[in-house]
């Protein structure tokens, strides 16, 4: 019998892990859960961080105690399904401020393990976010690049909004401003750039379809040797 290629086995393992997390979530009062998504590219704060092609993303979370969450995700692209282009890990603590507002503190790590050049952009981050129901979120983050020779802590501000329209369709909006250090993403000097997105989202029964227009300021940095602008982003996702 012909053996299944290793890269395909790895992709199947990631997807099965996500599906298993979702099944456990149903059995254990949603203490576990997950999602699988297909996106047209991989965008982080307005910057394309991987080749501009279809990306498979899998994510899972665990709620070990009231208010606490642990989550992880992986992004894969063809043809190297056995080599993730991005991985993330997050621990969070949330508090209800009242019946409308919630605050969450998070520690995050973003890894880009494709090669030595992309690993330079591995990022560690701490953030505080305030959310009004599921409609509006403000966040303040500080981050640096631990693998870079010199990497001071930088600050980013983000606001996102979800405006319900009709028939499970909503307007998705976002805007942010982030500082980048000198020599990051090919920049000759440090600076601050702005980014945002506007789009439509359809959500029903665990399925999500989304199309967004990505907007960035003229001085937006680019990953060295990486892709250029990606003005449109499409997503199909299924949560479990």
Regions found by a protein language model. Name each.
Residues 32-34, 66-72, 98-105, 134-140, ...:
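Repeated loop/turn-to-beta-strand initiation elements of outer-membrane beta-barrel proteins
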Residues 52-56, 83-87, 101, 120-124, ...:
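Residues that define the transmembrane beta-barrel architecture of outer-membrane proteins
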Residues 38-44, 74-80, 109-113, 132-134, ...:
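Transmembrane beta-strands of outer-membrane beta-barrel pores
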Residues 1-33, 240:
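Cleavable N-terminal export/targeting peptides
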Residues 40, 62-64, 93-95, 101, ...:
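Residue-level signature of outer-membrane beta-barrel architecture
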Residues 29-79:
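Short glycine/proline- and aromatic-enriched beta-strand/turn motifs that initiate or cap beta-hairpins
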Residues 163, 198-208, 213, 226-240:
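Outer-membrane beta-barrel "beta-signal"
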Residues 119-184:
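Detector for outer-membrane/organellar transmembrane beta-barrel domains
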């Amino acid at each position: 019998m012909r053996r299944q290629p290793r890269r395909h086995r790895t992709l199947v393992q990631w997807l099965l892990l996500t599906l298993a997390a979702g099944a456990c979530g149903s059995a254990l009062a949603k203490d576990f859960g997950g999602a699988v998504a297909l996106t047209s590219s991989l965008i982080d704060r307005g910057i394309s961080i991987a080749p501009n092609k279809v990306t498979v993303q899998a994510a899972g979370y665990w709620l070990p105690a009231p208010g606490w969450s642990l989550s992880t995700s992986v992004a894969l692209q063809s043809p190297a399904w056995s080599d993730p282009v991005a991985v993330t890990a997050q621990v969070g603590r949330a508090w209800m401020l009242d019946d409308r507002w919630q605050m969450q503190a998070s520690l995050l790590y973003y890894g880009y393990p494709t090669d030595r050049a992309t690993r330079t952009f591995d990022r560690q981050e701490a953030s505080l976010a305030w959310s009004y129901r599921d409609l509006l979120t403000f966040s303040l983050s500080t981050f640096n690049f631990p693998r870079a020779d010199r990497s001071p802590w930088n600050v980013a501000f983000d606001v996102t909004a979800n405006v319900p329209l009709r028939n499970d369709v909503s307007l998705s909006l976002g805007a942010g401003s982030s500082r980048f250090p000198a020599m990051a993403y090919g920049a000759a000097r440090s600076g601050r750039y702005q980014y945002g997105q506007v789009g439509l989202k359809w959500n029903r029964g665990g399925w999500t379809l989304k199309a967004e227009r990505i907007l960035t300021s003229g001085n937006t940095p680019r990953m060295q040797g990486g892709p250029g602008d990606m003005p449109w982003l499409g997503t199909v996702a299924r949560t479990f």
